[in-house]
Amino acid sequence: YFEIDVFENVIKPGKENILEIEVDSNADSNTAPFVRPLPLGWKQYTGIIREIYLILLPQISIADWKIDYNYNSDFTGCDVVFTFLFQNFNQVSSQSLSGTSELKQENIQEIGYFIEIYNVNTNKLVKDNIASPKYLIIHQAVQDTLRFTFYNIQLWSPETPTLYRFKLSIIGRNKTIIDRYQSAFAFRHIAVRSDGFYLNGQKIKLKGIHRIEQHPNYGISLPYEIQKQDVKLIKDLGINIIRTGPYPNHPYVYDICDQMGIMVLEEIPTFQIPPEIIGRKEVIEHASGLLQEMINRDRRHPSIIGWGIGSELNVSAQKTLHFVQQLSNKARLLDKRLLYYSTNMLDDDNCNNFVDFRLIDLYSPDIAQFKNAIEALIRVNLGSPIVIGRIGSSVVPENASGGYLDKTSLEHQAYYLGNILNIFNSNDRISGLFLWSFADWQGAVPSIAEGRSLTQSTYHWGILTENREPRRAYQYLKSTFINNTMLALTPGTIPDESQGKLIYIGFLIFIFLLILIKQHRWFGQNFRRSLIYPKIFFEDIIDNRNIQIWQTVVIGIIISASFGLGFASFYFFYKRNVFFDYIISSFILSKTVKTIIIYLIWHPIANVIVITVSLMLIIGLLAFLQRYFLLLFNVQCTNTFVFNIIVWSGTSGIFVLPFSMAIYGSLQHTSLLIIYGVVLAFFLIWFILRFLIALRMLFRYNFLKVLVSFIVVCFLLSGGLALFFQSAYKSFTYAKLYISVVCSQTR
């Protein structure tokens, strides 16, 4: 949002005048953190996406205004101070367009002004100073205040959204009207205490919903009728507050919220920015600019009760604390409204002293996890209200027949949100809750959780579709909480996601290995000897005896498949976990590659095959690089030779197979997951020890050289990849953010 002054003396009367506005949509180091594509984020629209207005103003007009309120104890009366800033554009020459300003002393003028205040509902004149206008001497600009005392005021609230309107008239000395301006305002007071929120002195629960301003046909440039329809649909649901998100919406939305009585939390797009980035001076300056633009544009709306300075921040970090402190100080200078941020962290919050309250974004915990989270928040939020900033349930739009036991069904979304709201309504310690989300929206990154949907970059978390068609959840919530009639929900059956096919594959791998051992004598002997008599076996590799390349390839495939089975099960189990998606997306920013990965995660058998092939290729690449790196130490060997060493050193990895077959079930129990991790670590150490034995035997006199070379090759490969991802995408910085959040929620 911006304004540009075009002065009269640069316009050529009677001729064509062209005003060009050029917008630079390229991201630089300052803006990149604010537009980074993230799963479950929003689609970035660039260019001119809002209306452009050419406003004709007289040379003397109102440039800015604000209202300060001082209510009495029972909110029946209020002392009001209007502050107006008048601008004399005739004082500034055309050179100001190029950055300089010249005052024209002959244009110093005397003006007067008066205001009329009406109750919008009754259109009744409440206050005015028509009989005694105030007169001022204006040079380039002048600021003035006007005081009124109101009695028996009608307060603005969701139940009675009473608006007032003031009409300001600027007059000359001869009472000629120079300019007129009018705007709505309201008497509304919001406060936060340790036990919750108070609107006009009365305690209120924030029953909210998260609205992302987007439509499949219009992008972010929604027509006014759709904006109004959205607010009405929200009002009809019994919602009393909207969380925008996370970026300022069109001002017309707030006009409608003013009229319909829906409170608003509005925030800037500082979404999931890690401490290492958010603490930079240039990022703080850019965020401060966004905050100032938002507040200056929207601070006159009574519906807006709070400004958000950040979303899903790591509030345990000192650099985040510095960011929050700087933006909090900035906001306090601009406006007196409440300040907040959101975080996924349940504890260890170092920043909450600089805001009035915080939102906790939980995404989609099951009911038991939600209750546990509330208990944890009660323990650590003894002096501040608990507000859940984001909680919802995603659906597969095509799954209209499944019952509520199917977690991707439309019925389950209704059942889940109904239970969440019941807990919210029955627990006085929860002061606010925002359902996620009003309608489906499009993102820039395919989501793993949308793997069964036809459109993976459309996030189906809405209780309405993208086209504003109410889902079962909307109908259920409206019926339950507005009409007090309970709609019946069908339980259905729990879909089988046990992945028994992967267990069958594990048995097939095991049977295949047994057949090879039984039918091929040399293969069986090599397999047994590599495990029982590794020193003798590696002596045979030195002498090129008994080892055929096909045996090495087969044993390598079996070992790789044993690990691939475990990885595929792990990925499939966490396919709907938001933070798993975030961590994956920290390293995979290509939309095409992410789409392929999503397909593999949702098709574990194909995933096992791809992981197996990938591991074999990695082993082959290591062997190739190792062979040529050894030449630096005058050590001669073949690619096959090094390949044999690496593969047969890992024969013990076959024993991972039964654990990989059981991992899907063990992931549901933390203790079993720890055991599986210990088993993996054991076999990894076993592999390293066997590999060192092989190197020691094969390169007796060059052992240290070979060992160092192998470590260097591995370091260069892994370090090079890590350096690339970190320098290009800040992958590890973002992954660290998400891991810290997961740790906070699991403590």
Which residues does each PLM region occupy?
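Extracellular glycoside hydrolase catalytic/binding regions
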Residues: 322-426, 459-463
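Active-site-adjacent substrate/metal-binding segments within catalytic domains
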Residues: 28-30, 51, 55-68, 153, ...
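Hydrophobic alpha-helical transmembrane segments and adjacent short intramembrane/lumenal linkers
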Residues: 599-613, 619-730
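Aromatic-rich peripheral "rim/lid" segments of glycoside hydrolase catalytic domains that contact
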Residues: 437-495, 500-505
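Substrate-binding cleft of secreted/luminal carbohydrate-active enzymes
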Residues: 409-450
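Accessory beta-strand-rich segments of carbohydrate-active enzymes
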Residues: 1-62, 89, 263
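Extended acidic/polar, glycine-enriched regions
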Residues: 14, 87-91, 106-191
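Selected alpha-helical membrane-embedding segments in polytopic membrane proteins
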Residues: 517-520, 524-634
